[in-house]
């Protein structure tokens, strides 16, 4: 256990098993073991387990229920679960899981995690329906807690496009996780459909289970308007986005649960209009349209998607206006200060 002081706050850091960039089976085992390893190391340290005023934790993962239960019982304090992914439901939607014993086991684990929470904050109003039975239990509170993004501390990016095939082009950028849940293939198809436009390029930054497949697809299609880079330090992102023009968002249309990806907040903070391919019914569709900060597509026809892309990139005056609205939206709805105040206010009613 390592103890640090960050901005006047005492932080206990615990070593943990790796849960990213590994196979699904190993990841599952590591996530199952993680809360028990953390609890063991907490109990072996000087962590003030009986002096907690509140517990706030984040999901994914679904496996922290036992850890939170012990901490809550020791301190007799209220708990707040920030619920971002409705798992295992989204994995069922995408065909990753079937309604077999494994699915029902995960569902039971998630249900237990919900049971130790006094308050649950979901990302969008569309996700409230998944917890209708939970909120009917005594002393439970369910609310929408918007995603948030702190003000970025910028440093010069390590990525330079000057000597690449994207030099001088208007850049569509995707930054973040590239996995099954994103449904990224349509972005490669979009790049292929625009390969004859020498003024447009595509930049993909991040990691995930689908990166290698996406790179192979781009190579097979002989695309010279697309580049891939591994994830970079978050402090480099603002200066990187300064070189770009449109932020890309993709969610697999089979999703039935809904969220607002963190990359949307990143783009808004940077003043980048967005081109989003989303699942039907998600709150982000209406948000982008109502605030007029980009274009949204629901479907699988790359020609229609391209039309929206060109509508964005070819209208510089509109891009500038969208950029200004994005900055305003970021400050209005997605500040970390607003989220912190909401969490503290909700917990205060239980103290």
Where are these regions (language model features)?
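An aromatic- and histidine-rich active-site surface loop
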Residues: 27-42, 52-77, 81-84, 89-90
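Membrane-proximal helix-turn-helix segments that form the acceptor-binding/catalytic region
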Residues: 43, 63-66, 70-74, 100-120
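Carbohydrate-associated surface elements
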Residues: 126, 145-148
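Conserved donor-binding/catalytic core segment of Leloir-type glycosyltransferases
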Residues: 149, 163-182, 188-191, 203, ...
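Nucleotide-sugar-dependent
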Residues: 182, 233-240, 247-268, 274-286
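Nucleotide-activated donor-binding/catalytic signature segment of Leloir-type glycosyltransferases, i.e.
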Residues: 203-206, 211-238
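A short, well-ordered alpha-helix in the C-terminal region of glycosyltransferases
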Residues: 304, 311, 318-333
């Amino acid at each position: 256990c390592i103890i640090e002081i960050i901005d006047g706050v005492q932080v206990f850091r615990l070593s943990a098993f790796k849960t990213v960039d590994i196979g699904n089976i190993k990841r599952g085992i590591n996530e199952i073991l993680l809360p028990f390893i953390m609890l063991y190391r907490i109990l072996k340290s000087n962590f003030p387990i009986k002096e907690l005023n509140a517990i706030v934790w984040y999901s994914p993962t679904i496996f922290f229920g036992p850890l939170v239960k012990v901490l809550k019982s020791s301190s007799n304090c209220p708990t707040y679960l920030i619920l971002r992914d409705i798992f295992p439901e989204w994995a069922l939607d995408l065909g990753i899981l079937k309604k077999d014993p494994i699915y029902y086991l995960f569902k039971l684990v998630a249900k237990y995690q919900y049971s130790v929470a006094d308050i649950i904050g979901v990302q969008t109003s569309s996700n409230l329906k998944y917890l209708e039975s939970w909120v009917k239990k005594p002393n439970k509170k369910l609310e929408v807690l918007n995603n948030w993004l702190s003000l970025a501390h910028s440093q010069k990016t390590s990525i330079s496009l000057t000597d690449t095939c994207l030099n001088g082009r208007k850049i569509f950028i995707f930054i973040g996780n590239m996995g099954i849940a994103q449904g990224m293939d349509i972005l490669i198809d979009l790049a292929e459909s625009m390969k004859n436009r020498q003024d447009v390029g595509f930049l993909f930054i991040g990691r995930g289970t689908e990166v290698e497949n996406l790179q192979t697809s781009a190579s097979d299609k002989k695309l010279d308007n697309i580049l891939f880079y591994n994830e970079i330090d978050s402090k480099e992102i603002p200066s990187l986005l300064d070189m770009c023009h449109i932020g890309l968002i993709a969610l697999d249309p089979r999703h039935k649960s809904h969220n607002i990806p963190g990359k949307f907040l990143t783009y808004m903070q940077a003043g980048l209009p967005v081109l989003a391919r989303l699942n039907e019914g998600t709150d982000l569709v209406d948000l982008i349209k109502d605030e007029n900060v980009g274009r949204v597509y629901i479907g699988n026809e790359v020609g229609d998607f391209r039309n929206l892309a060109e509508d964005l990139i070819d209208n510089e005056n509109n891009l500038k206006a969208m950029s200004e609205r994005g900055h305003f939206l970021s400050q209005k709805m997605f500040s970390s200060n607003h989220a912190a105040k909401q969490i503290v206010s909700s917990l205060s009613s239980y103290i």
